[in-house]
């Protein structure tokens, strides 16, 4: 092993360690706020990476259809909650269900950025709203459940997201 290979391995180790540290930090933050051990956290990273690859290949990331479907479902659930007389925070609901999906659609369909920073922004805007949307759709109705039950639901969500990833991105 020469110095160049050692430096490349060291750089790879630092980058991999940073990714693991960020994932661990995200897991702790999500658990401390929501009591959910979010097993499906890795799927968000995978969705972002595969969306970035699709954008760089000049294709429309198929994950935009999942984002639109989630946004529509959450909007319908919030309308149903309001019809039942439950309070609804329309500012955050419209942000996550209308504004950010519309921005993602504009970036993916209309702008199609050519530089890597714009492509990264597009991938992030495509994937980021899915976290709060899935929380509102899956975990908020179970807010008073035990941590064990939330873990079981999180594992189920993980498998659903793996299946959706295979459907939208292919094997």
Regions inferred by a protein language model and the residue ranges of each:
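Small-residue-rich transmembrane alpha-helical segments that form helix-helix packing/gating elements
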Residues: 1-34, 39-171
